[in-house]
């Protein structure tokens, strides 16, 4: 009987202490957990969960903030260890991690993982100091999540491509929220719908580190991601050691002549671990190519000295594995941000000073082919090749691949004293205001000497995309002239 009690205790510790599936109170089990990792929460279930969490725990706050195209307001959930939710108060003193979920309606992995993260933060299952604040949009594309498997907004826009142009109310609200939160680290949770197949449960994409700057970019590339990767691999190894030990202990116990019947009767777990389908739990992460346009949120973050990380869970993997891996990576990022908070704040100050001292601003980038790293890529051996390549999942394979993810500027401009925006361009002004761009009204009619750009030539697509014709290969000429400006 002692053996049985020991086995049950070890099992409880594994499930309870170091996995997302902590059952401190049945009141705060998520739909994902109640379904044993097969179902995601609906929008109403998500919001109800955070309402109950914020009512029960003083460290959690839930508020409505801005409007969306669906007519339903966005929510913002905040974890603050000392129950202080004035973000302006702590923007200089603590690292702020900002999480966005469900840009597409079928990106539910991050929605469920974030619910687990905030629940475990509230119940002190994640041990942190008071140096980090975690903020999240529970569901960004509300209309799409309510519609299920619908990627665009109710107005038929792709939010992933609307971060700068702000054609949607969602994107305009996101810009305002981002400026209010003023994060140090931004996490964008995605589900990766691709035909690619490999061992990874998730991959990641970051802000373009060269554009981010020498201080923050180097830290993101060489320290933060390295620490996250090392921590995940260590946890993966620890989980497997415990699981192997527990399985051996159970086998030995069940093979005992005198205790076999008692053990079978008294101890019948449905599974050894909630994550036992990952053999071993595969939390090794792999980078993907970095976007170099602020049309996407993680590169938009670079405009404000914020390190962006997009977590891409792989749709071909079991849902439980995806949510758990997503949770583990977010949790690890938060832990690193907590430990490195003072250093991150110092780097952010240095990066701001460096940016303000610049005379030129690069606005076009290309891959630097002279800088390359070789990375191990965990895939599978090819089984058959027809019109579609089939991989044999019983034969894992590790190959070395060349990875190019450093960029060099190809075009830049001399930073002017200011830009002049005519009042007729009110939509432009509204977007600049939403992005907290400093502006001053001209208070009297003025004749001013300015540098003016004229479009000399450009190319464009044959049909509009996302409400606009996308121009490219644009060439301008500059001349100096005197322009009459009106108040």
Predicted regions and their residues:
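Sec-dependent N-terminal signal peptides
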Residues: 4-13
């Amino acid at each position: 009987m002692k053996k049985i009690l020991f086995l049950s205790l070890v099992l409880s510790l594994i499930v309870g202490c170091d996995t997302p599936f902590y059952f401190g109170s049945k009141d705060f089990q998520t739909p994902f957990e109640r379904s044993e990792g097969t179902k995601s929460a609906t929008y109403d279930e998500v919001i109800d969960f955070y309402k109950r969490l914020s009512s029960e725990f003083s460290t959690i706050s839930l508020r409505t903030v801005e409007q969306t195209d669906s007519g339903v307001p966005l929510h913002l959930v905040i974890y603050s260890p000392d129950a202080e939710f004035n973000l302006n108060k702590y923007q200089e003193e603590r690292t702020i991690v900002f999480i966005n979920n469900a840009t597409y309606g079928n990106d539910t992995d991050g929605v469920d993982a974030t619910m687990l993260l905030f629940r475990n933060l509230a119940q002190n299952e994640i041990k942190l100091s008071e140096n980090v604040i975690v903020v999240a949009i529970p569901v960004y594309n509300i209309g799409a999540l309510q519609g299920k498997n619908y990627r665009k907004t109710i107005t038929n826009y792709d939010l992933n491509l609307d971060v700068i142009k702000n054609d949607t109310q969602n994107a305009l609200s996101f810009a305002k929220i981002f400026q209010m939160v003023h994060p140090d680290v931004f996490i964008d949770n995605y589900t990766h719908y691709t035909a690619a197949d490999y061992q990874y449960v998730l991959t990641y994409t970051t802000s373009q580190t060269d554009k981010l700057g020498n201080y923050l970019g180097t830290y993101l590339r060489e320290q933060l991601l390295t620490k996250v990767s090392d921590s995940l691999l260590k946890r993966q190894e620890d989980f497997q050691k415990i699981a192997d030990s527990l399985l051996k202990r159970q086998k030995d116990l069940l093979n005992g002549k005198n205790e076999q019947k008692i053990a079978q009767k008294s101890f019948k777990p449905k599974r050894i671990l909630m994550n036992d389908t990952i053999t071993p739990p595969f939390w090794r992460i792999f980078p993907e190519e970095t976007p170099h346009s602020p049309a996407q949120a993680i590169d938009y973050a670079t405009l404000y000295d914020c390190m962006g990380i997009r977590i891409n869970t792989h749709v071909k993997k079991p849902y439980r594995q995806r949510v758990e891996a997503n949770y583990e990576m977010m949790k690890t990022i938060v832990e690193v941000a907590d430990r490195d908070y003072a250093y991150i704040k110092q780097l952010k100050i240095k990066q701001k000073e460096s940016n303000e001292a610049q005379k030129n601003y690069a606005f076009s980038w290309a891959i630097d082919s002279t800088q390359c790293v070789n990375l191990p890529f965990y895939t599978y051996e090819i089984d058959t090749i027809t019109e579609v390549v089939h991989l044999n999942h019983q034969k894992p394979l590790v190959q070395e691949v060349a990875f190019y993810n450093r960029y060099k500027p190809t075009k830049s401009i001399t930073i002017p004293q200011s830009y002049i925006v005519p009042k007729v361009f009110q939509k432009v002004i509204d977007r600049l205001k939403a992005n907290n761009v400093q502006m001053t009204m001209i208070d009297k009619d003025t004749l001013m000497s300015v540098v003016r750009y004229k479009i000399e030539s450009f190319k464009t697509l044959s049909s509009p995309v996302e409400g606009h014709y996308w121009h490219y290969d644009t060439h301008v000429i500059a001349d100096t002239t005197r322009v009459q400006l009106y108040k």
